[in-house]
Curated annotation (Swiss-Prot):
Name of the protein this chain belongs to: Protein-L-isoaspartate O-methyltransferase
Organism per entry: Methanocella arvoryzae (strain DSM 22066 / NBRC 105507 / MRE50)
GN (gene name): pcm
Main localization, broad class: cytoplasm
Matching CDD domains: AdoMet_MTases (cd02440)
Catalytic residue positions: S33
Cross-referenced InterPro entries: PCMT, SAM-dependent_MTases_sf
Location(s) in or outside the cell: Cytoplasm
Keywords, ordered alphabetically: Cytoplasm, Methyltransferase, S-adenosyl-L-methionine, Transferase
EC number of this enzyme: 2.1.1.77
């Protein structure tokens, strides 16, 4: 994480707070996750050199950049954002900082990104009512998916696909913005 300058991924007015361990507003009623939460999610995912990673909820691209460092030059991070302005800003920041192995897409993240599936790892940075089936379907076997689940009281769930079986582990309570879309919350 020390190779990713968090202050570059937040609006100018909150840059003085960039290194506090707290979520920060990035506009459009969205936030950048606290550094400790990014670390917890990355640790649960166990991203390896060469992994193909899907992220749902790009925001301004900070978490994608951290995962790109973990995946290394031979890995790739595909990240999906539903808000055009955030996707555009993320593309700009990631490009300026040289994160060439991160590809930003504008679409409904609850449907995943089947074009490049299957993925070794999937990270979801917004809370869903349940784990969206398209994401499980796009997960490689073996593979890992981490997602916050719940409306008011959320749990960070690690979903592992191993030998055709799905194993789910509760990693603890969290607080995320809602995941909106076909397989997420509607009209939140």
């Amino acid at each position: 994480m020390d190779r990713v300058p968090r202050e570059e991924f937040v609006p100018e007015d909150v840059r003085p707070d960039a290194y506090y361990d707290t979520p920060l507003p990035i506009g459009h009623n969205q936030t950048i996750s606290a550094p400790s939460m990014v670390a917890i999610m990355c640790q649960a995912l166990d991203i390896r050199e060469g992994n193909k990673v899907l992220e749902i909820g790009t925001g301004l691209g900070y978490h994608a950049a951290v995962m790109a460092v973990l995946a290394g030059a031979s890995g790739v991070v595909y990240t999906v954002e539903r808000i055009p302005e955030l996707a555009d800003m993320a593309r700009s920041v990631l490009s300026r900082l040289g994160f060439d192995n991160v590809k930003v897409f504008l679409r409904d993240g609850t449907e995943g990104l089947p074009d490049f599936a299957p993925y070794d790892r999937i990270s979801v940075a917004a809370a869903a009512p349940d784990v969206p089936q398209p994401l499980v379907d796009q997960l490689k076997d073996p593979g890992r998916l981490v997602i916050p689940v719940g409306r008011y009281f959320q749990q960070l769930m690690l979903v592992e696909k191993k030998g055709g079986q799905i194993i789910t582990t509760d990693k603890g309570g969290v607080a995320f913005v809602p995941l909106l879309g076909k397989y997420g919350f509607k009209g939140y």
